[in-house]
Regions:
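A short, Lys/Arg-rich alpha-helix, primarily the initiator
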Residues: 1-17
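The alpha-helix within a helix-turn-helix
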Residues: 15, 26, 55
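Residue-level detection of the helix-turn-helix DNA-binding "recognition helix"
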Residues: 16, 30, 41-43, 70
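Short alpha-helical DNA-recognition segment
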Residues: 19-38
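DNA major-groove recognition helix of helix-turn-helix/homeodomain DNA-binding modules
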Residues: 30, 47-64
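Interfacial/linker helices and their anchor residues that mediate assembly or domain coupling
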Residues: 67-103
Length: 103
């Protein structure tokens, strides 16, 4: 999996590699084809459950698609910020801290 591709680019390329139409994926996932099209174009964000459906359909490791989906959310949130690296360092530290107090 290419780490630079967005979630939408990944699911579109997988669909095209398997020569599947949007309507076929729609039938397999129970997600409207217009919604899938918006996922592929990055115009709409799927839920975790929907991401897992795509992983199953395309026979991809769930972790790969979850990482792509989550990293897209972070990237889009930070795209206009100036101190991205510092924000990510602090966020990583906070995640580690929160995991220790969550136990």
């Amino acid at each position: 999996m290419c780490l630079m591709k967005t979630f939408g680019e990944i699911i579109r390329s997988k669909r095209e590699e398997q020569n599947l139409l949007l309507r076929e994926i729609s039938a397999l996932t129970s997600i409207d084809q217009s919604v899938i099209s918006k996922f592929e174009k990055g115009e709409r964000k799927p839920s975790r459950e929907q991401v897992l459906k795509f992983a199953e359909i395309y026979k991809m490791p769930q972790a790969d698609l979850i990482i792509s989906w989550q990293s897209d959310k972070v990237a889009y949130e930070l795209i206009d910020e100036n101190d991205v690296e510092e924000i990510l360092k602090v966020a990583e530290s906070k995640v580690k801290y929160l995991k220790t107090i969550k136990k």
